[in-house]
Amino acid sequence: MSETLELASALIARRSVTPMDAGCQQLLAERLRPLGFDCERLDYGEVNNLWARRGQQGPVFCFAGHTDVVPPGPEAQWRHPPFQPVVEQGLLYGRGAADMKGSVAAFVTALERYLAGGHRPRGSLALLITSDEEGPAVDGTRHVVETLSERGERIDWCLVGEPSSTERVGDVVKVGRRGSLNGRLTVRGDQGHVAYPHLARNPVHQALAALDELVTTRWDEGNDHFPPTSFQISNVQAGTGATNVIPGELEVTFNFRFSTEVTADELQQRVEAVLDRHGLDGRIDWSLSGEPFLTAEGELVAATQAAVRDVCGDPPVLSTSGGTSDGRFIAPTGAQVLELGPVNATIHKVNEHVRAADLDTLSRIYEGVLRRLLG
């Protein structure tokens, strides 16, 4: 069993369902300290965070990832117990194999080989690991980045180990992500009997025209890197469940996935203008999950493309598709941020797995990035 596979298995065996870390970060620190890393706990609330750094000079290259995993779901449906890693027919099974304990293990073994080779990096090496990526993502990477900023520490290049690949390791690298803005619209009405609508005020009827306008609006045209901004209604709640009662209140939750062509403030203003135009009696509560970010070019992109080509034979596709990641908290500091990790076909599913050999491939790619960026 390779060192990367062995470490990934040891991490999977720790039942670190978000926001728990279950000793994963302690295990990582034990591997990093002998390499010369200063390992600092930046815990916040229930969340465990590890900031490990080797060197004091810039530029700073950082691997970023998480040790928490989503719940396994019905464990009886798993081929093997989700927290008992098993390699079967070349596949490593276990919750977190792809998302993202395999990547975290590859970070460490890439660093071990790189430093064992006698390399003297032109700058500092760092790891930022949290147990709050799969949860609210408030007390994890966001908190660590704020702490580093207060101390005057910055990250120049950041490689996030999210499972970016689709068919084979390294076929897709994420160079950015769309922003995510949530809204909860509450429309007030007057409850009443459906037979006497003149004595009531139906908030559903009030809201229909405004909602239709929001759904059909073209928010922007996108650009070379991002598709047009998307508006999706995710939940609609109204009424008591009875068929003869006009509801007194309507609640609609919705989400924008937005490009760099528009800001969260602009979207909020445009939505509120639509509601005002339709005279709705209500309010909106907004929640910004993250701004869009893009690293379209630069040293990190070039080094990653070259490392993937060296190890895999073909250059990666550069993409901004998919959901949000913790890269959204690091990019606003000015860092170049990319995401590169295992194949994502089974993430969050029963029987999550990766090809065992892929983790060694990933570790070699990570080592190649280090060599090209830091010498």
From Swiss-Prot:
This is Succinyl-diaminopimelate desuccinylase. Keywords: Amino-acid biosynthesis, Cobalt, Diaminopimelate biosynthesis, Hydrolase, Lysine biosynthesis, Metal-binding, Zinc. The gene is dapE. Its EC number is 3.5.1.18. One of its GO terms (molecular function) is acetylornithine deacetylase activity. Its cofactor is Zn(2+); Co(2+). It comes from Alkalilimnicola ehrlichii (strain ATCC BAA-1101 / DSM 17681 / MLHE-1). One of its GO terms (biological process) is diaminopimelate biosynthetic process. It catalyses: N-succinyl-(2S,6S)-2,6-diaminopimelate + H2O = (2S,6S)-2,6-diaminopimelate + succinate. NCBIfam families: dapE_proteo (TIGR01246), PRK13009.1 (NF009557). Catalyzes the hydrolysis of N-succinyl-L,L-diaminopimelic acid (SDAP), forming succinate and LL-2,6-diaminopimelate (DAP), an intermediate involved in the bacterial biosynthesis of lysine and meso-diaminopimelic acid, an essential component of bacterial cell walls. It comes from the Bacteria. Binds 2 Zn(2+) or Co(2+) ions per subunit. Zn(2+) 1 binds at H66, D99, E162. It is an enzyme of class 3 (hydrolase). Zn(2+) 2 binds at D99, E134, H348. Pathway: Amino-acid biosynthesis; L-lysine biosynthesis via DAP pathway; LL-2,6-diaminopimelate from (S)-tetrahydrodipicolinate (succinylase route): step 3/3. Pfam families: M20_dimer, Peptidase_M20.
